[in-house]
UniProtKB/Swiss-Prot annotation:
Belongs to the peptidase S1 family. The gene is ACR. Residues 412-421 have a biased composition (Low complexity). This is Acrosin. Residues 297-316, 327-383, 397-421 are annotated as: Disordered. The keyword Disulfide bond applies.
Amino acid sequence: MVEMLPTAILLVLAVSVVAKDNATCDGPCGLRFRQNPQGGVRIVGGKAAQHGAWPWMVSLQIFTYNSHRYHTCGGSLLNSRWVLTAAHCFVGKNNVHDWRLVFGAKEITYGNNKPVKAPLQERYVEKIIIHEKYNSATEGNDIALVEITPPISCGRFIGPGCLPHFKAGLPRGSQSCWVAGWGYIEEKAPRPSSILMEARVDLIDLDLCNSTQWYNGRVQPTNVCAGYPVGKIDTCQGDSGGPLMCKDSKESAYVVVGITSWGVGCARAKRPGIYTATWPYLNWIASKIGSNALRMIQSATPPPPTTRPPPIRPPFSHPISAHLPWYFQPPPRPLPPRPPAAQPRPPPSPPPPPPPPASPLPPPPPPPPPTPSSTTKLPQGLSFAKRLQQLIEVLKGKTYSDGKNHYDMETTELPELTSTS
């Protein structure tokens, strides 16, 4: 006991020095000043986090006309002026005068209308920057930055979180990480939790998370999937915008690798939480807060690359309702049912009707009347008188001669006509 006392005193002094040197939020990032040795079991129905366990946790609260404040989303403090959160928190609520941000809190009062007390700090919103390509239908690029005023003072319970190094890549594998927030402790809770909750979650392979019986292709390459296949432990409504944090393998710092974005229900089997990965947006963050400010909050020792940069692909093409998953609500479009093993072939389409004729053809000319069959060929070139004489001779059964030709005529017996009188 005597030998351990100096060590404990040194730890307290070290934390005090870090807090003092970090008054301008320019000191080391991702340091947990206080930790629960047992750890919180889960956010949904779990245990409370220790005060100062996650010093970069921020409560984003709607500020009403009568000065009441209502917790809406979580966020991560990056430095004395900037907070990282989710873009969908500001849909329909992007007026800077409607927001107040609370720092260094373990417990918050829903609907509070009184100024916060130390060590808590409250700040106004100077600017809200939503990603230019944020898609509210698919929750693509669900990331935003909030500039606060006046700048925050870091200290015993307030400190900046870390962001991944450029060489880190997307978080993958069976790594255990943490989530925290003031969200609902059960899916149908009447309001968010007043106590900051924490939970340990596992990273889930994106291909498994996107499989047919899970999210069926709705998870994008810039997302991180975290939770458990059986559910039971998850983020919930009110945790949106809060951090997904993984411990650096070479340091004691925690890195914000994801932003709570969306999910179907809370803690359901095969419906884990979906987070916006921070690594693909490092350049975007640097363009807003400055490259030097970003370098200040990146891990000192870059880990070896784990994945290549994600390919750019168009947003998910399934039609989804424009209604947002507010407070981490389930996306309104239900998962499409799994198709049966064998789909019947569709019936053949009927043949198209024959095209109408261009124009009716004229009827063919009538065939010439048949010539009367006769074994007697009349001479050609005879005058009417001679032809008449020839006809008379034929009727009489005589032979006709025109002086040049001699013709034998067959006699045709005609029946005698009898009078009916």
